[in-house]
């Protein structure tokens, strides 16, 4: 992939950009083999890739510069701003949004936050696009509610320019730290969730719910999990760290009992909305800590699917799963190193199959799906 920002030495986020996609995939596959060394694997499935560019559905932009000439992108450690509006990872549909937002910031009087001076209001712009219908969610991350009245007053102009903006919010992040968002979310539109659809499964994206940033590869990941579960005798399933329910909603059947657990209430609201649309009455989603939920249960499902953050599921949950001994475990991970550590804490399970998904091209990161069977 050609990138003017990389060539100019202004951005180094895509550290593997000089390698071909095939070279990247080979290196990631070798890394996964190294991490699982000593753990017998029955079947290595062919890795799955996706588009080389324009694949991201989300932009996280630091806002710097002045209210008359705002700059969207990132800050180097020395405070130097870099404009990332031309990043080739973003779809072409983002460009007109960025263009309209620059004069809008002046209209609304949203002074960009100055990190060195600890002054200003607008810290970040968070933009998400639905692959399903092109609808977008825009979040203004502000230091305080001081400019809310001005922001609301200026919004009709922005919505006339960009009718694709379905969900608009103000997120309040008052702390002088590099934290992307705060706890308070103020909706500025009637619509509060963005509709998405993978493999004919309706999904919803809310402001504070995690959603994969590479929809093409994510849809293939969910479809693969559905295929694997469909080949197993599963009538009762847990989906831990379930997010908006992508895995569980793909894998569930009308006959299956499924419980999805996620600590973020916004994500659970999305999952419940999708389950209702699908008419799946035996799906239950709850906003709880996944480890605390699992260790408090007295019943054993046929299959436990886990999709933890980068830290993995950890030894306490591994120990409990080993003791509870469900027949199958599916582990989806964005950090194969912690996944490999966790699997080594499950000695009574063998790896039936593994598949790598290149969710993050031009970086060393990747997603991996692993099916474990009780011995």
UniProtKB/Swiss-Prot annotation:
Pfam families named in the record: tRNA_U5-meth_tr
GO biological process: rRNA base methylation
InterPro entries: 23SrRNA_MeTrfase_RlmC, MeTrfase_TrmA_AS, MeTrfase_TrmA_CS, SAM-dependent_MTases_sf, U5_MeTrfase_fam
UniProt binding sites for S-adenosyl-L-methionine: 212, 241, 262, 307
Highest taxon listed in the record's lineage: Bacteria
Binding-site residues, [4Fe-4S] cluster: 3, 11, 14, 87
Record field: catalytic activity: uridine(747) in 23S rRNA + S-adenosyl-L-methionine = 5-methyluridine(747) in 23S rRNA + S-adenosyl-L-homocysteine + H(+)
EC number: 2.1.1.189
GO molecular function: 4 iron, 4 sulfur cluster binding; iron ion binding; rRNA (uridine-C5-)-methyltransferase activity
Keywords annotated in UniProt: 4Fe-4S, Iron, Iron-sulfur, Metal-binding, Methyltransferase, rRNA processing, S-adenosyl-L-methionine, Transferase
CDD domains associated with the record: AdoMet_MTases
Residues of the active site: 334
Family the UniProt entry places it in: Belongs to the class I-like SAM-binding methyltransferase superfamily. RNA M5U methyltransferase family. RlmC subfamily.
Record's function text: Catalyzes the formation of 5-methyl-uridine at position 747 (m5U747) in 23S rRNA.
Protein name as it appears in the record: 23S rRNA (uracil(747)-C(5))-methyltransferase RlmC
Organism listed in the record: Salmonella paratyphi A (strain AKU_12601)
């Amino acid at each position: 992939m050609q990138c003017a920002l990389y060539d100019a030495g202004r951005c180094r986020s895509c550290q593997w950009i000089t390698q071909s996609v095939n070279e990247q995939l080979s290196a990631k596959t070798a890394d996964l083999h190294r991490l699982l060394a000593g753990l017998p694997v029955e079947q290595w499935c062919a890795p799955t890739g996706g588009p080389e560019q324009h694949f991201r559905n989300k932009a996280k932009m630091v806002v710097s510069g002045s209210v008359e000439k705002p700059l969207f992108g990132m800050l180097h450690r020395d405070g130097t701003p870099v404009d990332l509006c031309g990043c080739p990872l973003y779809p072409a549909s983002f460009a007109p949004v960025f263009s309209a937002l620059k004069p809008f910031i002046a209209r609304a009087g949203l002074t960009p936050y100055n990190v060195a001076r600890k002054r200003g209001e607008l810290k970040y712009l968070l933009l998400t696009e639905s692959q399903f219908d092109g609808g977008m969610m825009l979040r203004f991350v502000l230091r305080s509610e001081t400019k809310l009245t001005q922001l609301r007053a200026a919004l009709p102009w922005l919505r006339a320019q960009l009718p694709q903006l379905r969900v608009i919010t103000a997120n309040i992040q008052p702390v002088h730290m590099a934290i992307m968002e705060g706890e308070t979310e103020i909706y500025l539109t009637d619509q509060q969730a963005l509709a998405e659809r993978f493999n004919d499964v309706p999904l919803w994206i809310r402001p504070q719910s995690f959603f994969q940033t590479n929809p093409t590869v994510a849809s293939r990941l969910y479809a693969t999990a559905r295929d694997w579960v469909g080949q197993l005798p599963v009538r009762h399933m847990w989906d831990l760290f379930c997010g908006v329910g992508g895995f569980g909603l793909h894998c569930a059947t009308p006959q299956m009992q499924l419980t999805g657990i996620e600590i973020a209430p916004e994500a659970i609201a999305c999952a419940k909305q999708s389950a209702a649309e699908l008419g799946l009455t035996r799906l239950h989603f709850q906003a709880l800590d996944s480890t605390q939920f699992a260790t408090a249960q007295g019943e054993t499902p046929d299959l436990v699917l886990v999709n933890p953050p980068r830290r993995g599921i950890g030894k306490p949950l591994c120990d409990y799963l080993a003791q509870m001994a469900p027949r199958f475990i599916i582990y989806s991970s964005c950090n194969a190193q912690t996944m490999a550590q966790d699997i080594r804490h499950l000695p009574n399970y063998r790896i039936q199959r593994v598949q790598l998904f290149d969710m993050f091209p031009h970086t060393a990161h990747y997603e991996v799906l692993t099916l474990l069977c009780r011995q």
